[in-house]
Amino acid sequence: MINVEIVRHYNKWREHKQINKSLIKKITQNILLRFDNFSKIKQFELSILLTNAAEILILNKQFRNIEKATNVLSFPSNELNWQDLYSKLEFLGDSDYMHLGDIAFCYEVIYNESCEQHKTFENHFIHLLIHSILHLIGFDHQNDTEANIMENLEIEILSYFGIFPPY
């Protein structure tokens, strides 16, 4: 089971009814089912903040020391490495619960990017959600090899949901 908490700090998000707990759960589940080691976990939790440029700028400055609004920020609850997902998740011990982390999305940046890239707002959000969840479970793009692995997985998941790959 995946429990999703959504907090909306910006009313423009309400215009996008398709962006809801059901969608987020479906995408999260699709990602987690790709890794056998997550099968022993019975309950996952994920927190989503849907906010605006002013708030994301504060968060980006506070946590990354970057004074600029960004499309999305991911805050993993666990220090995972994607390579460990194929072996045992020993840090969980006997627990069958895992808080994946928190993700903050910025409406204005996502809106502007979707217009510039000729995508629907929802499809761009889905791509960023996939990207963020992959960060929460230990994927990164600090070098070309990691970036290729992460991008290929994003493309595979986006294709599953009928969304044209952005790369």
Swiss-Prot record:
It is an enzyme of class 3 (hydrolase). Disulfide bonds: none annotated. InterPro entries: MetalPrtase_cat_dom_sf_prd, YbeY, YbeY_CS. GO terms for cellular component: cytoplasm. It comes from Rickettsia rickettsii (strain Iowa). Its cofactor is Zn(2+). It holds the Pfam family YbeY. One of its GO terms (biological process) is rRNA processing. One of its GO terms (molecular function) is RNA endonuclease activity. This is Endoribonuclease YbeY. Its EC number is 3.1.-.-.
